[in-house]
A protein has these predicted regions:
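Non-catalytic terminal segments and appended small domains
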Residues: 1-141
């Protein structure tokens, strides 16, 4: 409905490598219909999780915009950043992910970028309240 906003959680898990940032835009079909993102449409370097977008209908015709489950409605661009890689260390790391999914991504992060996703990094996330990480990290080789 017109001017109504909703939070939309992606089905896919997004992993932004620590040397990139992610930028999201609505697919042109929906942009022309009046769909817009209210929150910052970006994902920080090193972010892993499901994206939550706050979308709003700004249609000039004031008609509802229907997005069906599974319909692709956004573009996601990876942009290489300049300078030293600095991974996201915020409370939304691993948002809307199961322990099994998190464990899988931790293995990838440690294997591919172990020098960046090191013990200091994991401890900083634990301090944010992501206590479940201790249990997962000690299970890993």
């Amino acid at each position: 409905n017109y001017l109504e906003h909703k939070n939309v959680v992606s089905e896919q898990i997004v992993f932004v490598p620590p040397n990139c940032v992610g930028h999201m835009t609505a697919k042109s079909k929906y942009g022309r219909a009046g769909l817009s993102f209210l929150n910052a449409a970006k994902a920080h370097s090193g972010f892993v999780g499901r994206i939550v977008l706050e979308v709003v209908n700004l249609s000039n015709e004031r008609k509802p915009i229907t997005i069906k489950r599974g319909d692709p409605f956004m573009h996601f661009e990876f942009i290489t950043r300049v300078g030293e890689a600095y991974p996201y260390k915020g409370e939304y790391q691993f948002q809307y992910m199961s322990e099994e999914e998190i464990e899988m991504y931790i293995k990838i992060m440690q294997r591919e970028w172990g020098d960046i996703f090191n013990e200091e990094y994991w401890r900083s996330l634990e301090k944010l309240g992501l206590k479940f990480l201790s249990k997962l990290l000690y299970k890993l080789p």
